[in-house]
């Protein structure tokens, strides 16, 4: 999501102008901001909308919800749920089709920069990692029960970490020492355990980066929820409506890319079958393009370096 430096009031939204320009195609439309964060995209969308326009935003984070509730605009509504609940939430609000869906994936800078949230290895804090700290299982709770196989699969698949098995074994070995050392509950200790195992260092990257990413994705079911919301967005978009997705790592971007490509392609048919091309169903999406943060934005906000924005438009009725 939108990176920042410093405290939560200094929140820089990545690809702000580019995303909103791609999203808003009609001023009287109904739009969805699936990841409100601190409201950078939402506020600019509202500036672009006519009085008859409408914006519905989602976020899991109670602090994001508190920020959203300060927006006194009758065109705006906030939903304290994951964007995976998009289909249900839209129906509950009496909306049929929407004109655009924006997803700014990952964690926000206020979440990263607050040690109490447990997302970062740069400062010691509780091992939480939940987007919504009031719901679900924390990272510490999961680490206290996960098997070597479960740990290996999560760290390997969601962190693309080559030392996943060794890290998993080290974590389970540390758990065996809980009676003497107490449970593993701090980000600092987790980062140290990983650093002791990962001997090959990537230039400019902390050895704990991949493991922290993997555990966070698992705890919040980020990739599974992304699949759900992409399907929901496709079904809810009106003809001409836009799907705009900003990703910050390859796992997310791969899912988004493949989804858009799959729904922008005519189904493959065996040429031996008596079916004409004109008889095949038209694909529902058209890919508009891919956008990266500019050099100027990256210079001002280094966390924008990894951002990739993909845009597709629904062309089917």
Curated annotation (Swiss-Prot):
UniProt KW rRNA processing keyword: yes
Transmembrane recorded as keyword: no
Gene Ontology CC terms: cytoplasm
Keywords per UniProt: Cytoplasm, Methyltransferase, rRNA processing, S-adenosyl-L-methionine, Transferase
Function field: Specifically methylates the N4 position of cytidine in position 1402 (C1402) of 16S rRNA.
HAMAP family reported for this sequence: 16SrRNA_methyltr_H
Name of the molecule in the record: Ribosomal RNA small subunit methyltransferase H
Organism: Paraburkholderia phytofirmans (strain DSM 17436 / LMG 22146 / PsJN) (Burkholderia phytofirmans)
């Amino acid at each position: 999501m939108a990176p920042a430096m410093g405290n939560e009031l200094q929140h820089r939204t990545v690809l702000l102008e580019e995303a909103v320009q791609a999203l808003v195609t009609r001023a009287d439309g109904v739009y969805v901001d699936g990841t409100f964060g601190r409201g950078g995209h939402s506020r600019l969308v509202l500036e672009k909308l006519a009085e008859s326009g409408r914006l519905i935003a989602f976020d899991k984070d109670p602090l994001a919800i508190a920020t959203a509730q300060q927006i006194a605009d009758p065109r705006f509504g906030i939903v304290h749920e994951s964007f995976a609940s998009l289909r249900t939430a839209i129906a509950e609000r009496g909306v049929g089709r929407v004109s655009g869906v924006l997803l700014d994936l990952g964690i926000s800078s206020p979440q990263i920069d607050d040690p109490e949230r447990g997302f970062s290895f740069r400062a010691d804090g509780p091992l939480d990692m939940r987007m919504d700290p009031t719901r679900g299982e924390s990272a510490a709770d999961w680490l206290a029960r996960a098997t070597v196989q479960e740990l290996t699969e999560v760290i390997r698949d969601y962190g693309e970490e080559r030392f996943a098995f060794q890290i998993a074994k080290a974590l389970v070995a540390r758990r065996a020492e809980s009676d003497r050392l107490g449970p593993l509950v701090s980000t600092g200790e987790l980062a140290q355990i990983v650093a002791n195992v990962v001997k090959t260092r990537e230039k400019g990257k902390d050895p704990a980066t991949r493991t922290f990413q993997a555990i966070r994705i698992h705890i919040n079911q980020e990739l599974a929820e992304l699949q759900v919301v992409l399907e929901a967005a496709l079904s809810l978009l009106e003809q001409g409506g836009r799907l705009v997705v900003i990703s910050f790592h390859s796992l997310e971007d791969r899912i988004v890319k493949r989804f858009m490509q799959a729904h922008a392609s005519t189904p493959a048919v065996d040429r031996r079958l008596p079916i004409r091309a004109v008889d095949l169903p038209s694909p529902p999406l058209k890919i508009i393009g891919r956008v990266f943060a500019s050099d100027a934005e990256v210079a001002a906000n280094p966390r924008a370096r990894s951002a990739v924005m993909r845009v597709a438009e629904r062309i089917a009725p």
